[in-house]
Amino acid sequence: MKKLKINYLFIGILTLLLAAALWPSIPWFGKADNRIAAIQSRGELRVSTIESPLTYARINGKKYGLDYELAQQFASYLGVKLKITVRQNISQLFDDLDNGNADLLAAGLVYNSERVKNYQPGPTYYSVSQQLVYRVGQYRPRTLATVNESQLSIAPGHVVVNDLQALKETKFPDLSWKVDDKKGTAALLSEVISGNLDYTIADSVAISLFQRVHPELAVALDVTDEQPVTWFSQLDDDNTLSAALLDFFNTINEDGSLARMEEKYLGHGDDFDYVDTRTFLRAVDGVLPDLQPLFEKYAQEIDWRLLAAISYQESHWDPLATSPTGVRGLMMLTKNTAQSLGLTDRTDAEQSISGGVRYIQDMMGKVPETVPEEERIWFALAAYNMGYAHMLDARALTVKTRGNPDSWADVKQRLPLLSQKQYYSKLTYGYARGHEAYAYVENIRKYQISLVGYLQEKEKQAAEAIKLAQDYPAVSPAEFDTETFPFSSFLSQPSSNYLSHSPSLPFSLKKKDEN
């Protein structure tokens, strides 16, 4: 997947270019007969979306997602409440606009020439490519020339239909596909993963998130180049909503909150490793259940799944792990660190985890208060890996190179420079393996995403299995077997660790109260 990047320059230029055109309607708060006035009179911003880990998800009453956070901030900016409506596919989203049931569509929708003929786009905030996917171990098509409708299904309203039609007319006359009116993109990706469908097409971000939980999903080829993602509203002569959106995006671009959200949701999607992800998920099944009670016991304000991800990065959950430099145990503590924490046996799982948490908390306490709460953990983990003094150097270097020392996105880009003489020779604490600290934190974030997503899916499967069992009360649990009922062995565990904690936002250190 190509590097995802918010189009800050585009937002700035578009704001300047359109401000003049929209100027008559910019004082939207003072008029009573425009779209913004209607939203404020109603007291709510109506946003339609599609449920996905990136756009919007609701787990046990907690909401998260890039589009959800942006929409929540925009509603607050307008002084109204946010009303979210979830639809199953893209066609239903645009139906909401056509029928006047939504003010905005915020669902990772791609900007294209056909859509803007009928709908008003907002600023673009990241970009994706459309990719053809297949299951690892199955035939990988290298071209669309021989792909047909018996193999390829896509979701209704998918933007790629126009691209496929153009390719059919210009390059691949035998290309054909089926639009599945009953399934959205996420459902079709699941069909490919299960082997019930050969191919589907999805955007690169959705695919990268699915791969963290389903490494068997593979990209066959890019169908399109990078395409900008935007929100959509109704197209008419009332430009007040467009003007408000432009002003809002310009504001969050300038104050840095847009960059923080990019880092939070899009800053760790590159460099998928099939073998590493598969190995990790196998360890989740085979090793984690024995260690989970300890992670939960000592995690305190740290999400236990984040703590588990840290430990896996350190030792692959091997209590006896030892490095050539002498660090040992689940949290790979040095002898001096262990002694300072009062530990007597670094290879004892409980001592190692409790000591590692205290050491991380010590690093957290040193991170300047100017660093946003949800990013403090990444600074602390980098310091945990390479030493806090070198983190100070990284922040100083970020300032010298005109970055924001309180932004993890900015600081992490400078970490590899700490091993280059032209930079470390001018820093207070000298040489550091900053590239290792960079990889260390990025790997932890990827493991955390995989773990949270995997456990969420396990919980969903278990809930579906329980519901199915309730629908057939005459059949006793003993009559189920793993061939005919694949989740029976999972359900037979009376107190599965996988279900002992409800899933929540995987991208933050602490859960936030819902507004």
Curated annotation (Swiss-Prot):
UniProt xrefs under InterPro entries: Lysozyme-like_dom_sf, MltF, Solute-binding_3/MltF_N, Transglyc_AS, Transglycosylase_SLT_dom_1
Assigned GO CC terms: cell outer membrane
Topological type in the membrane: Peripheral membrane protein
Residues making up the signal peptide according to the UniProt record: 1-32
Keyword presence, Signal: yes
Gene Ontology biological process terms in this record: cell wall macromolecule catabolic process; cell wall organization; peptidoglycan catabolic process
Residues annotated as catalytic: 314
Keyword Signal: yes
Catalytic reactions on record: Exolytic cleavage of the (1->4)-beta-glycosidic linkage between N-acetylmuramic acid (MurNAc) and N-acetylglucosamine (GlcNAc) residues in peptidoglycan, from either the reducing or the non-reducing ends of the peptidoglycan chains, with concomitant formation of a 1,6-anhydrobond in the MurNAc residue
EC nos: 4.2.2.n1
Residue ranges of the region described as LT domain: 270-515
Chain intervals for the UniProt region annotation (Non-LT domain): 33-269
Stretches the record annotates as Disordered: 493-515
Keyword tags: Cell outer membrane, Cell wall biogenesis/degradation, Lyase, Membrane, Signal
Annotated localization: Cell outer membrane
Molecular function as annotated in GO: peptidoglycan lytic transglycosylase activity
HAMAP family membership: MltF
Family per record: In the N-terminal section; belongs to the bacterial solute-binding protein 3 family.
Protein role: Murein-degrading enzyme that degrades murein glycan strands and insoluble, high-molecular weight murein sacculi, with the concomitant formation of a 1,6-anhydromuramoyl product. Lytic transglycosylases (LTs) play an integral role in the metabolism of the peptidoglycan (PG) sacculus. Their lytic action creates space within the PG sacculus to allow for its expansion as well as for the insertion of various structures such as secretion systems and flagella.
Domains: entry comment: The N-terminal domain does not have lytic activity and probably modulates enzymatic activity. The C-terminal domain is the catalytic active domain.
Name of this chain's protein: Membrane-bound lytic murein transglycosylase F
Organism: Citrobacter koseri (strain ATCC BAA-895 / CDC 4225-83 / SGSC4696)
